[in-house]
Amino acid sequence: NGRNFEYISEDPYLTGKIAAAQVRGMAKHQIAGTIKHFCANNQETARSRANSVVSERALREIYLKGFEIAVKEGGAWSVMTTYGPVNGVWTAGSYDLCTTILRKEWGFSGIVMTDWWAMANYEGMTADKTMRAPMAAAQNDIFMVTSDAKASMEEDDMQKQLECGWLTCGELQRNAENILGFLLRSPALLHMNGRICQEELDAMNRKEDGDVLASDLKNLDEEENGSILISGALLH
């Protein structure tokens, strides 16, 4: 089942709708939810290396659809790629996934990050954690490690590929722009820098259709029989 045991459902439409609602709900409380794992990582055996061979139709209608809905309807700001490859191209360094589909087709404008110690590959080569230039070129903006992890101390190929021209300074600047854009529009940073006041920050937690606040319940008499109208766009 790969990472599917962590997912919302087996139905891509239902998954997308629920994920979009969750992302919107988190955003109301100044939290940017990360949707993952992008994509087609279903197999438990060798899940960090297994190659998911899938047709474009199945990819778009089943494995990408939930992510598409979460991006377009949920306004997701952050995406995490999987460990392994899809059709031979490791997702952490897949330009088709991270740029063509996610950013150009769906209009995603946030950050993309790898799973912990993910690998990427150049065409025809074995994948490795040190191959991070393909990640940067694909607009996978953040290589996820922790400060005490061995991978943090390993060399990578970024400088080498910059010097030989495979990776450009502009591509790295694009990654930086994605990360800074993500940070600069976050309500927490806007408030910390005095760009929005506390009242504006509090207003972002405003009540919306379908929400139930404590203030709504204060006039209810627990001894009194009756009915309550619950309404909202997401109520079915």
Please place each PLM-identified region on the residue numbering.
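Glycoside hydrolase catalytic-domain context in secreted enzymes
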Residues: 1-236
